[in-house]
Amino acid sequence: MSIDRQTLLSVAKSIRSGAKSIRAQISPIHPKGYPFVGGFALASIILFWIWTPLGWIGTLLTIWCALFFRNPARVTPVREGLVVSPADGRISMIAPVVPPAELELGEQPMVRISIFMSVFNCHVNRSPVAGKIERIVYRPGKFINAELDKASEDNERNSLVISTPNNGLVGVVQIAGLVARRIVTFVHDGQTLETGERFGLIRFGSRLDVFLPEGTQLLVSEGQTAIAGETVLADFQQADGGRTYRSN
């Protein structure tokens, strides 16, 4: 049975289209994760030589590690005044608190939105607003449970202060947790960020705090799931009548 050229071209086009569709659905791995995924993969091969069931366990861990370091594309709302989530995870706390001293944002309370990232969330962090990085401050510390309120004071953390064009200063704090022992930041002082732009990651479970001026209109509540770069946390253009801080 012969197949004409037109049929072959049609089949090839369908295969290419299918391959593109599959690639679009699979998130790439962030380069910072290559050593970890490679290490797990190598360990899996060795475990297969030792005992096959161990090899399969290693394979599952390799897949989990690859998923942990996934670096998906996100569709970010860009209207002036919107504040988007800097991390994937659960909004664990919303409260008015005095920001950490290293942020140099004064001693008046600001609205703090805390987002807890489990080991199953994507851990690439994104800028919640557009603006210029005024300063980046690293502070060593403990590694207690990141869900606890005191983790914002006691744990290892890396802080960014971003100056927005029209809405003042916003603080973003990466906080290490029980498992996470390494905070990574890709940016530097003076750099300009777009809303939703990647600026860092925290390895294996952690927390992100966002500090906003009091009176900012909040659009989320405690317990809600947030998606980095997409979920809108607040709106500076609706500064009156912010939400009450309570769990639903």
UniProtKB/Swiss-Prot annotation:
Is synthesized initially as an inactive proenzyme. Formation of the active enzyme involves a self-maturation process in which the active site pyruvoyl group is generated from an internal serine residue via an autocatalytic post-translational modification. Two non-identical subunits are generated from the proenzyme in this reaction, and the pyruvate is formed at the N-terminus of the alpha chain, which is derived from the carboxyl end of the proenzyme. NCBIfam families: PRK05305.1-1, PRK05305.1-2, PRK05305.1-3, PRK05305.2-5. It comes from the Bacteria. It holds the Pfam family PS_Dcarbxylase. Pathway: Phospholipid metabolism; phosphatidylethanolamine biosynthesis; phosphatidylethanolamine from CDP-diacylglycerol: step 2/2. Signal peptide: none annotated. This is Phosphatidylserine decarboxylase proenzyme. Its main location: membrane. InterPro entries: PS_Dcarbxylase, PSD-A. It catalyses: a 1,2-diacyl-sn-glycero-3-phospho-L-serine + H(+) = a 1,2-diacyl-sn-glycero-3-phosphoethanolamine + CO2. It comes from Nitrobacter hamburgensis (strain DSM 10229 / NCIMB 13809 / X14). The modification Pyruvic acid (Ser) is found at S206. GO terms for biological process: phosphatidylethanolamine biosynthetic process. Keywords: Cell membrane, Decarboxylase, Lipid biosynthesis, Lipid metabolism, Lyase, Membrane, Phospholipid biosynthesis, Phospholipid metabolism, Pyruvate, Zymogen.
